[in-house]
Amino acid sequence: FVSREDCVVTQYLAGGKKTLPELILSIDPLETLPKFGVKKWGTGPEVNMKYELVYDEAGTYLGQAAHYPVFVESELQDKGYVTMVRILHTGGSRNVEQTEGSKKIHIRGAQAVWILAKTAAQVEMGEMEDFPGVKAQETIDAVLADLKSAVAKYRTKEGSWDYERALALQKEQQRETYGTVSFHLGEQTADSGEEGVEKETNTELLQRQKNTPQMLQKLMEQIYQTGRYVQAACAGYSAPRLCGLWTGEWNPGWSGAYTMDANV
């Protein structure tokens, strides 16, 4: 989940009674992403951006600092961003292995792994020829400090990390936004083919719809609620954001045209 409380992306992997499979964490060089620098009309400006991959020798974090490409009429001249990822685990071992173009963090035999990530924009990254420079390092340090605070806030006496407590604080804030609107199309009855649907999962509702000639009101409600949740989750409290779908490509086919406006 993305925490409104702490402004970090939080992931939790647990092996239960068994240890987790080997986990490999790395950031691929941007130019290895499909369609990097490839656009319908020719070469994309991203081929002229600069970036550096950031790691520590102990494998506690990894990240990327980048300077946006410079071109005529760019709104991102002398700007950039930093994304850092903090890695925690209980049990097992961790080591860093050098690979061509990057490093990989290997975690073996862990009982649980927590991955915290944060991205920050830098509107004064400086001249392209000076990158990475002072501003990039200052932004890296600031993001790592925020991640360190999030780690300390939920660290338990046993040395693990309290994911449930972090999630509870996020739910509390998200519930306030999500609960401002309700949507109900009426009572479900046997005549409408919807008797007993209140406790059905989305998967069960979709299966029921396949066997029901008329549109299920409950399914329409669930589609609306799911879409509203996504929009609320990506909007924050400030100006609306656009929520795009990540396809693993640098220049996806929709090229930014099909996004969800959180201000709908």
Regions found by a protein language model. Name each.
Residues 1-264:
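Aromatic-residue-lined binding/catalytic grooves and analogous aromatic/hydrophobic interfacial grooves
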